[in-house]
């Protein structure tokens, strides 16, 4: 009888140990899986077509904006999705005003800026940049019936009124190259700039070529002026180089971005940009 009780006790003890071991193993697996979960937290304006814009549904591959009922789509979103998918990251996109993007990545609220941002020397003092994911020349948008609509060189714009988006190289540098320019106050975003030009409040707006193509595609009264080499804006290569910005020293995200971007051809990037322009909404929803 004593032996039977002893055997029963031993069996129960072994069962408990096995159960505890299994629970411990499950907890470790759960912890390990949580540790392995990687999230690419991207910041962008969500109102800078064709790079990025907000919309009300997930059509054409749009991504839900974190903390919002809206979705975001555009060239930047396509690039972000490609980087995330090819490097095993979940993608999370936050809507952040342009002037707050660098601060957001520095404070770890996001870990990447994919927002049509050019890799200028000044910005390189604050963040690290990936390889380029687009080359964007500076061009002019103007109403077709404006006095400066037939400009062929920068000199032909002499005396015009001009503006661009605040905090951009177009406003800080390119506009000043126009002789006798009436430089108006910078505008907060591209939709505001398009409205200003279309309404005649300003003669010309200086933007990157993709944004100009997007603007004229949805605003029939506007035209784009792209000057021939040597006849337009003198812009450093770094200013036209669009890249992903990350917090200084964040080599994991930077290497992941470069792995994907370095493998992309110019043709692939151009195709994505053409797709973004073709699916953009008539107006950004703000």
Where are these regions (language model features)?
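Acidic, polar ligand-binding/catalytic clefts
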Residues: 85, 90-156, 235-237
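C-terminal motif of bacterial Sec signal peptides marking the signal peptidase cleavage site
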Residues: 18-22
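Extracytoplasmic small-molecule ligand-binding "clamshell" domains
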Residues: 34-117
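Ligand-binding clefts/hinges and TM-proximal coupling segments of bilobed small-molecule sensing domains
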Residues: 25-29, 169-185, 224, 256-286
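A ligand-binding cleft/hinge motif common to bilobed small-molecule-binding domains
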Residues: 100, 116-126, 173-176, 203-238
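Short helix-initiation/N-cap motifs at beta->coil->alpha
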Residues: 75, 92-105, 149, 184-199, ...
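Flexible hinge/capping segments at coil-to-helix
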Residues: 31-32, 60-62, 144-161
């Amino acid at each position: 009888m004593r032996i039977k009780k002893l055997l029963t006790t031993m069996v129960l003890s072994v069962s408990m140990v096995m159960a505890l071991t299994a629970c411990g193993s499950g907890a470790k697996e759960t912890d390990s899986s949580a540790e392995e979960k990687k999230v690419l937290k991207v910041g962008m304006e969500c109102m800078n077509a064709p790079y990025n814009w907000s919309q009300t549904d997930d059509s054409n591959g749009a991504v839900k904006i974190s903390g919002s009922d809206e979705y975001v789509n555009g060239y930047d979103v396509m690039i972000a999705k490609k980087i995330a998918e090819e490097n095993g990251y979940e993608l999370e996109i936050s809507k952040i005003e342009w002037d707050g993007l660098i601060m957001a990545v520095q404070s770890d609220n996001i870990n990447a800026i994919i927002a049509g941002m050019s890799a200028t020397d000044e910005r390189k003092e604050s963040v690290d940049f990936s390889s380029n994911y687009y080359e964007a020349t500076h061009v002019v948008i103007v109403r077709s019936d404006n006095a400066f609509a037939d400009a062929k060189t920068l000199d032909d714009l002499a005396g015009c009124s001009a503006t661009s988006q605040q905090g951009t190289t177009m406003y800080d540098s390119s506009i000043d190259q126009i002789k006798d320019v009436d430089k108006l106050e910078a505008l907060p975003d591209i939709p505001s700039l398009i409205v200003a030009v279309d309404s005649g409040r300003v003669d010309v707006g200086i933007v990157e070529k993709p944004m100009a193509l997007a603007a004229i595609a949805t605003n029939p009264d506007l035209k784009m002026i792209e000057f021939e080499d040597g006849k337009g804006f003198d812009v450093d290569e770094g200013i036209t180089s669009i890249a992903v910005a990350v917090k200084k020293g964040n080599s994991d995200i930077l290497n992941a971005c470069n792995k994907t971007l370095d493998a992309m051809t110019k043709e692939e990037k151009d195709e994505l940009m053409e797709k973004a322009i073709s699916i953009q909404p008539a107006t950004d929803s703000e």
